[in-house]
Amino acid sequence: MSLLEYISDEDLFNEVETLLTKAKKKKDAAEKTFTSNVIDPFGALFEAPGFSSHEEWRNSELARQQQKTIQNHVGTFHQKILGHVEGWRDMGIGGIVDLLNEERRIIAEVKNKYSTVTGGDLADKYKGLDELVSPKHSRFKDYCAYFVNIIPRKPTRYNSPFTPSNKGSGTLCPSNPNIRIIDGASFYELVTGRPDALQELHSALPHAIEYILSERLGQQGFSIPDKDSFIKYFGLAYG
């Protein structure tokens, strides 16, 4: 039985491996260049009281750099996972859109967190989506465009017209039922038809991560420490 009902284990494992490999390369590079990079000597001293040794502080700094790499690529991970769902296509990094479903006439731009794009840049995203689904655009005419925030600002679901503030005029962008903003849990349900699809992915990831690290990346017997404590963060983000 597959870990997830909506994509194969091999597709899930491959995407997990891609992300973990990027993180490992970043960590290895950071270790090699740690002393050659400019470290804030003042900040390091103010951080020192929070650690029991310089080695502990150094490991924390390396972990922080690795964490930043992971966070920068998690949005792409979701894009690729959803692109494996039947009927959906991942358009790749730098594509005109992130996800496409021609049969359902849906396009989507996927961001990992509500704070990835903020302020006046949101109006630019609206404008870009508006141009894509406008009658003048032959390929996506009359499609529904979604701006997806996988992690919402608050733990509530939403799927509503996308009306960010226009930085030029100070007014809201016009409401259009075919230009929408949606949280990650709701979008996963829209894509898969499964109300808890995003939580199912989150629950499957510990096994997938342990398998990839142990079987493909040379960390035999790896197990995520204190797994239940990490699992609880899903409820805080999504309610």
From Swiss-Prot:
Which Pfam families does the annotation name? RE_Eco47II
Which Gene Ontology biological process is one annotated for this entry?
DNA restriction-modification system
**Broadest EC class assigned to this enzyme:** hydrolase
Provide the reaction this enzyme catalyses: Endonucleolytic cleavage of DNA to give specific double-stranded fragments with terminal 5'-phosphates
Q: Which InterPro entries does this UniProt record tie to the protein?
A: Restrct_endonuc_II_Eco47II (IPR019057)
Q: Which GO terms describe its molecular function?
A: DNA binding; type II site-specific deoxyribonuclease activity
Q: What is its EC number?
A: 3.1.21.4
* Alphabetic keyword roster: Endonuclease, Hydrolase, Nuclease, Restriction system
Q: Extract the coiled-coil ranges from the record.
A: none
User: In terms of domain of life, where is this protein from?
Assistant: Bacteria
Biological function: A P subtype restriction enzyme that recognizes the double-stranded sequence 5'-GGNCC-3'; the cleavage site is unknown.
The protein, known as: Type II restriction enzyme Eco47II
Organism name: Escherichia coli
- Quick one: which gene encodes this? eco47IIR
